[in-house]
Amino acid sequence: MKLRDSLAVNKSIRLQAEAETWQDAVKIGVDLLVAADVVEPRYYQAILDGVEQFGPYFVIAPGLTMPHGRPEEGVKKTGFSLVTLKKPLEFNHDDNDPVDILITMAAVDANTHQEVGIMQIVNLFEDEENFDRLRACRTEQEVLDLIDRTNAAA
């Protein structure tokens, strides 16, 4: 499933969210996927367990994190949620803190995870100005329009 379609169909966008800790921020993204029946509630704990084991492996660029677990950790279908934070948070990453954009991903298999999920997110942020454009979005439609413009330019 495409990033844009998943966000639109699942109504899984939350802008200017408030969170006290990185764990709270991750939970916001996972809860959107739980509400859309994309993942089971246990997916949240699986992500936390992954961080405990491997560190903040999903902080992939300055200000951007892509929380995700493994397919067998509660994924029902492939989907994404997108959360922007009102106040950036520390994820304990050496290079890319603080974070204020979270794209939570659930993939049914490793191939989908790598080829579909990561590539769509890389495409969105290939234009670094899209970080600030996304931070400026205040409605779901503005986010979807930004993704549409990026896809049209690709």
UniProtKB/Swiss-Prot annotation:
GO molecular function: kinase activity
The protein's name: Ascorbate-specific PTS system EIIA component
Keyword Transcription: no
Domain (PTS EIIA type-2): residue spans on this chain: 6-150
Transmembrane segments: none
Record-linked Pfam families: PTS_EIIA_2
Residues at the catalytic site: H68
Any GO BP: phosphoenolpyruvate-dependent sugar phosphotransferase system
Modified residue annotations for Phosphohistidine: H68
